[in-house]
Amino acid sequence: MNFKCVQFQSIFNILFILIISFPGGLIYLLTGSTLSFWLRESEFDKITIGLFGLVNFIYILKFLWGPLLEKISFSTLSNRGYKYCLVITLINCIVCVYVLTSFNPNTNFTPFVLCLIVLAFFSSIYDMLIQSSQMLLITDKNWGISEAACTTGFRIGILISGSGALYLSTIISWQDVYRTMAILCIPSLLLIIFYPLKFKDKMIANDFDKFFSAFYDFIKKPKWIVIISFMLLYRLQDSFLSIMPNMFYLDIGYTKQDLAIGYKAFGMCAAIFGGVIGGFLCRKYEYSYLLKRVLIYHALSSLSFIYLYFLNQDIISLYIAVFCQEFTKGLTMSPFFSYQLKCCSSRYCITQIALITSITNVGTILIGSISGYAATYLGWSYFFIVAGLCFIPAYILILYLPKTINSV
C-alpha cells in the first residue's frame, strides 16, 4: 500500500480507527444476521425473523441525539470528552450483550426484544462516534484510506461475530457464543482508554439551544435533496436482500459449517478486499464515476444467487457466488462512506453524519424488514431478480449529484 502521502501521525490514527471499528461490526451482526441463525434454531419463521430487523429502527433516529453528543464531545473537556463518550458507549454495549444472554427468545420474548433495542441504541451511538472520528483525526485527502481501514475493522468484527459465532454455535450454546463476543470487545475498549487522541482541528462545542443549526447548514448545500435521496437508495439492493441469503443457503442444502467457512469467513475476506480496493480507487477517480461503476458491478452479482439456485449447488459454486456478492459489496462501501464524509461540515460532523447514516438506514431497516415477505411470496428466483434491479434509482440519482460540496 502506498502511504507516501499519509503523515506519520495519520498512520497511527488510521490504525486506531481500524481497531475501534472492530466492536462496531461485531455488535452490529449480533442484532442482525447472527441473530437470525439463533432465531431460526429457536423455530421462528422467516417472516418473524425478517420483522426482527425493525429492532434496528433505532439507527434511523440517532441524528436526534447527535447535537447532544457534539455538546458533550466538544465541550471544555476537549479530546477527553470525545474519549469518554467512546468508552461509556462501548461499555454499555458490552453490558447489553451480556444481559441479552440471560433471556430465552421463546420464553422471555419481551425482555429479549427490549434488550436488543437498548443494545441497538448504544451501538448506534458508537457507530456515530466512529464515523465522525475520521473527520476529526484524518485529513480529507485520506478519507478513502481511512474509510477502507474503518470498513476493514468493521468487517473483521462481522467476520468474528458471523463466521466465528456460527462455528461456535455448533459447539456451545448461543448464550455462550454471545458472551464470548462481548469479551472480544474488551481489547478495543482498552485501546480507546489509553490512546492519545489529537484532533487535526480545534473543535468548539455548539450551543445545544441551536439544535437545528446542523440541519440548516446541511440544507444550504447544493442539491441537498438529491444527496438525501441518493443516501436513501444507494444500498437498496443490500437492504432488499437483508438477511435472506442466510435462509437461502440453508434452504438449498448447505450446512452451518459450510456457511461458517464459505459464506461468513471467505465472504468477509472478499468484502474486506473489496473495501480496500474501493478505498484506494477513491484517490484515483472522482466520486460520480466510481459510484456508478461499482453500483453496476454489485447489481450483476445477484446473478450468482440465481446460478446457485438453478444450476449448481456444490461447495465451489458457493465460494464463487459468495465472492461475487461480497467483493462487490465491499467495493461499493468505501466510496459511498467516503462520499458521506464529503457531504458533512466538520463543525457539525457528529450530527450530520448521524443524519446521513440515519437516512441510509431507513432503507436498510424498513426494506429489510419486508424481505421475509418478499422471499416467501416471490420465490427465490424472482426475489434475486428484483434485488438485481434495485440499483436503477440510485444510478439515476448519481447523474444529478453536485460536482463539488463544501464540507468545511
Curated annotation (Swiss-Prot):
Its main location: membrane. GO terms for molecular function: transmembrane transporter activity. CDD domains: MFS_AmpG_like. This is Putative transporter AmpG 2. Belongs to the major facilitator superfamily. The gene is ampG2. It comes from Rickettsia typhi (strain ATCC VR-144 / Wilmington). It holds the Pfam family MFS_1. Gene3D superfamilies: MFS general substrate transporter like domains (1.20.1250.20). InterPro entries: AmpG_permease/AT-1, MFS, MFS_trans_sf. PANTHER family: MAJOR FACILITATOR SUPERFAMILY DOMAIN-CONTAINING PROTEIN 3, SOLUTE CARRIER FAMILY 33 ACETYL-COA TRANSPORTER -RELATED. The keyword NAD does not apply. GO terms for cellular component: plasma membrane. It comes from the Bacteria.
